[in-house]
Amino acid sequence: MTTVIDATMAYRFLEEATDSSSSSSSSKLESSPVDAVLFVGMSLVLGIASRHLLRGTRVPYTVALLVIGIALGSLEYGAKHNLGKIGHGIRIWNEIDPELLLAVFLPALLFESSFSMEVHQIKRCLGQMVLLAVPGVLISTACLGSLVKVTFPYEWDWKTSLLLGGLLSATDPVAVVALLKELGASKKLSTIIEGESLMNDGTAIVVFQLFLKMAMGQNSDWSSIIKFLLKVALGAVGIGLAFGIASVIWLKFIFNDTVIEITLTIAVSYFAYYTAQEWAGASGVLTVMTLGMFYAAFARTAFKGDSQKSLHHFWEMVAYIANTLIFILSGVVIAEGILDSDKIAYQGNSWRFLFLLYVYIQLSRVVVVGVLYPLLCRFGYGLDWKESIILVWSGLRGAVALALSLSVKQSSGNSHISKETGTLFLFFTGGIVFLTLIVNGSTTQFVLRLLRMDILPAPKKRILEYTKYEMLNKALRAFQDLGDDEELGPADWPTVESYISSLKGSEGELVHHPHNGSKIGSLDPKSLKDIRMRFLNGVQATYWEMLDEGRISEVTANILMQSVDEALDQVSTTLCDWRGLKPHVNFPNYYNFLHSKVVPRKLVTYFAVERLESACYISAAFLRAHTIARQQLYDFLGESNIGSIVINESEKEGEEAKKFLEKVRSSFPQVLRVVKTKQVTYSVLNHLLGYIENLEKVGLLEEKEIAHLHDAVQTGLKKLLRNPPIVKLPKLSDMITSHPLSVALPPAFCEPLKHSKKEPMKLRGVTLYKEGSKPTGVWLIFDGIVKWKSKILSNNHSLHPTFSHGSTLGLYEVLTGKPYLCDLITDSMVLCFFIDSEKILSLQSDSTIDDFLWQESALVLLKLLRPQIFESVAMQELRALVSTESSKLTTYVTGESIEIDCNSIGLLLEGFVKPVGIKEELISSPAALSPSNGNQSFHNSSEASGIMRVSFSQQATQYIVETRARAIIFNIGAFGADRTLHRRPSSLTPPRSSSSDQLQRSFRKEHRGLMSWPENIYAKQQQEINKTTLSLSERAMQLSIFGSMVNVYRRSVSFGGIYNNKLQDNLLYKKLPLNPAQGLVSAKSESSIVTKKQLETRKHACQLPLKGESSTRQNTMVESSDEEDEDEGIVVRIDSPSKIVFRNDL
C-alpha cells in the first residue's frame, strides 16, 4: 500500500508542476489512493464482460483486453475531459514502478505456467527450448540491433541499438501462454513455444540488464560479462532449486490442509523472486521458472484429491486475474506513451519506423528459426515446416517488454540516454506489443487453419463420432427408464432430443453408427497409435486415482506416471510403459549379502525391504491400472481387432509384473504382507471417513460429534503417513510367545529359549532336516513357507506341499522316536527356532501337556497323509478343528475297536491295528484311517506299492487294536470336504460400479445399529466367558489366529464362525461393505501361490457325504440384506500374522 501511496504522491507532484485547468485542479484535490482499487474492480468487470461476449468468436481474449486498455488510456490521456475517479486509478497504476509491476504479476504468472507444464515433455523439448532461448535471443538481438543502427535516423550508438534489440527479443510468456491455451494448440508445439517464452524471457532480461549497464557508461570486459551472466543464470537456477527443495520438504509435514498448501506455493514463488532479483542479483524470472518446473517434476503428486483440484482452480483464477489486469494496464501504458507526451509530432514522424521495426522483428524471428531449424529437427520431438511457421508467427511481445521500456524511460534524461530516447523506447515497445498482439495474435488461428493444423485426424474423428453414437444409446436408455411416470405420465422424446445438441452431427441430424461394424476394428496404424495413447491415458488416470485413495505413495506415483509419459512418446510401437519400470522392479544386488556374515544382516534386510516394498507397490499398481484400462477399453470398443491388439499387448506386459510378485512372494512374503497391511489400513480409515460424512449428511450426529470423530480418523491417517508399518525381524522372545506351542510350555521352560542366541532367520533353500534321519528336535515356524517332500509318503496329490506360520514340524517323530517322515526345505525367508528332543520329551510327564503335544503333531500328519483334503487348509483352521468337539484323542488297549463313521477320518498315532471285514493286515502308525463307505475320492489313487497303502492309508469301518494304540478321530462332515478355500476377489480386478443410492442405502443400513446399541450384552456375555476355562488346544487356536491371547467375546463378534458355528463357518469371514471406489491393490498371502492349481485339484477331489453339514450358514446368508452386492467378496485371513512394527521402534 505504501508503494501505491508513493506513486499517488508522485502523480500529484507532477500535476502541480504543470499548467492545469481549474477542472483538473478540482479533480486533483479529489484524488485518493483508494482510486487504485476502483481501477482493479473495473478491469475485472471489463474482463468478465469481454470473456462472456467473446466466447465462441475468433477474437483472442488478450487482444480484446489490450484494446480496452488502449481505449481507457486514450480517454484519460488524450481526451479533454478525463475519467474522474477511474482516471485517478488509471494514473496511479500507470505510474507504478516497472520493477514493482514485474514483481507483482510475474511470479504468479510464471509459476502457474511452469507448474502446469508436463515434465516428460519438458525433458524431451528442453534442447529445443534452450536453443531458442539462448542462441535464438542472441541472434535476434544482433539482427535487430544491427538493423536499427543502420536504418533508423536517431544516431544511436551500438550499445543503445543493441539495448533496444535485446528488449524486443523476448517473446512474452504472459501473452504467448494465454494465446496458446485459448487456441488449443498441440501439446508438443505448446510446450516448445511456452518453454521458449519462459526461458528466453529470462535470457532477454539478462541481456537487457547487461546492455543497459553498458549504455549507462559502465565499461565491462569479457571476464566481467561472463561472470555477470553466470551469476544471473546459474544463481537463478540454484536459488529456484533451493526454494523448491525446502518447500517440498515442508509440504511433507502438512497433512490434509489445503489452505496452507496453496498459501505455501504463493509465498515461495514471490519470496524466491524477491530473493533472486533484489538480494542475490540473479534473474527472478529464471528463478520462478526453475521453481515451477521443480514443482511440476517432484511436487505434483504431493497435492492429492481435493487439494489438487483446489490448487488447480486457485492458480487458474490467479492467472486469469493477473492476465486481465496486466493486459489492460499494458494498453493504458501504450496509450499514455503515445498520447501524453510533448513529442507527439516527433513520434508522428516515427510511425513509419514503428511499422518498419515490426517487419524487422518478423524477419529476425524467421532468421532465428531458419538458422536453428536443422538442430531443432534433431532434438526432442523434432519440428516440421508447418510447426516452424507457427513458431515464427507466435513471437508475441507483451508486459515484460513494456516494463523494461518503462525502466529505460525512468533511467533516461542523462548524458548517456536522453529523455527523447527513453520516450522513443516506450513508443516503439508499446507499438510492437500492440501490433504483435493485434496482428499475430488475432491471425494465429487463421494460420493454423490455413496450414490445416486444427483438423482432427481421421482416427480421432471416428472415435468422436463413435462416442456420440454411444451417448445417443445411453440417452435412449435413460429416457426409457425416466420417460414414464405413474403420477406425471410420459415425457416427450422430441422435446428432450432438442435439448441434447451434443448428439447431433454437423448437419443437425442424429448421429448414426460411424463404423459400419468394421472401421473401428481396422488395423490402420494411425488408429492403433491413437488407441494406445487413449489406453495409456486411462492407465495414468488410474494412477492418479490410486494416489488420491492412498494405495500408492508419492514417490511410486511419480515413477509410474513417468513411465506412462515416456510410453506416450512411443505409441507407434507396442505398449512399453513397463520398460520404464524395470529399473525399479528387481531384487537389489545387496540382497545377496543376506547370506554373508560380513555385513550386518539387519542393515541389509532394512535396505532390501525398502527396495522390494517399493517394487511391489509399483508392480501391483501397474497390474491394477492395466486391468482397469483394459476393461474400460473393452467396454468402449467392444469386440474389435484393434482393441484386441492393445489388450493383448497390455496382458503381455503384465506377465513380467506377475512373475516379480510371485518371486517376492516365494522369497520374502513379509514384504507383500506389509504392503497389503498398509493399503488395507488406509482403505479402512477412508471407509470410516465416508461413514462419518454420511452420518453428517443424514443428520444423525451433531457438528461437534462429527468433528471429534473426524479428528480421530485423521489422526490415524496422519500416523499411517508418517509412521507406516515396515518389515522388521521381531524379537525371539516375542516370536516364541506368539507361537501356539508356547501355551503348553511352562514359563521355566520358555525363559531360556527367549534368551537364546540362535539365528532365527533362514533364507530360501535351507534344509531343516532330511527324510529318514534320526529326530533331534522340533522346528517352530514363526513366519514364512517351508516345503516338504518325501519318497515313502504318497504325495502325488499334493500340488504345493508347504507349511506356514504356526507349524510345529518334527514333533511327531520326536514323540514316537521314529525317523523323520520327509525332507523339510525353506521355500522363502523363514523365521524359525529349533528345540532339542530332550526338552520336548521332558514335558510328557504332565498328561494335559502330553495330550496337547499329540494333538499338535496330528496337524502336520493331516497335511502329510491326506493332502487331498487338508493341503490348502491353514494351520489356524486345523487347530479350530482340533480344539472343538469335532476331534477326539483316545488311547486304546489291546482288543478294543476303533470305529470310523462315514463323516470322519482317523489318524493312528501309536500302535498297531487291523481292519475288520477286509483283508486282515497289520497297520502300523502313522496311518490315515478312512471309512470304507466314504467317498472314494479321499483315498490315494496313486499307483503306489501295497506297502505304502498298508503303512499310511487304510479304509475300514472298524479297526481292532493289536497293541496299545493312540488315535485321534476328526468329524469332517462339518468341515465340508467339498469346500474350496474362499478368497476375496482380487482387487486387481476393477470394482463393480455402484450407484450413489446403493451406497447411501448401505450406509443407512449401518446407521440402524446407532439407534439400538446393546449396552449390557457385552458385560453379561463377558461374565459368562470369564467362567469358562479354555483348553490348551483352544488357547493355541487363539494364538494361531490372532497372534496373542485375546478377549474371546470381542473376537467372536468379528469372527463369529469360530466360536458360534464351530468349524463350519471358520473359513468365511463376513466382509464389511466397503465403498467400491476404495478397492485394495492385491498383495496375495503366501497361501495363494498356487491358488489356481488348488482349484484345479478340487475338480478331481471327491467329497464325503455331508450329512452333518449344518444349515446355519445357509440361514445366515438368506437373512442378509438384499441391498448387499451379490458378488460381495470374502475376506480371507493371511496364514501368518504379519510381524509388522512402526518406525519409532527401530
Swiss-Prot record:
* Recorded catalytic activity of this chain's protein: Na(+)(in) + H(+)(out) = Na(+)(out) + H(+)(in); K(+)(in) + H(+)(out) = K(+)(out) + H(+)(in)
Q: Where is this region: Disordered?
A: 981-1001, 1102-1128
Q: In which tissues is it expressed?
A: More expressed in roots than in shoots. Mostly localized in parenchyma cells at the xylem/symplast boundary in roots, hypocotyls, stems and leaves. Also present in root tips epidermal cells.
Induction line: By Na(+), in a SOS signaling pathway-dependent manner.
Molecular function per GO: sodium:proton antiporter activity
Biased-composition ranges, Low complexity, are 986-996
Keyword match Methyltransferase: no
Membrane topology per the entry is: Multi-pass membrane protein
Q: Which Gene3D superfamilies is this protein grouped with? A: 6.10.140.1330
| Task of the protein | Acts in electroneutral exchange of protons for cations such as Na(+) or Li(+) across plasma membrane. Involved in Na(+) and K(+) homeostasis. Required for cytoplasmic Na(+) and Li(+) detoxification by secreting them from the cytoplasm to the extracellular space. Regulates Na(+) content of the xylem sap.
Tell me its family.
Belongs to the monovalent cation:proton antiporter 1 (CPA1) transporter (TC 2.A.36) family.
What is the additional note? Positively regulated by the salt overly sensitive (SOS) signaling pathway that involves the kinase CIPK24/SOS2 and the calcium sensor CBL4/SOS3. Transgenic plants that overexpress NHX7 have enhanced capability to grow on high saline soils.
Provide the assembly information: Interacts with CIPK24/SOS2 and CBL4/SOS3.
The molecule here is called Sodium/hydrogen exchanger 7
Whose protein is this, by species?
Answer: Arabidopsis thaliana
Q: Mind giving the lineage of the organism this protein is from? A: Eukaryota, Viridiplantae, Streptophyta, Embryophyta, Tracheophyta
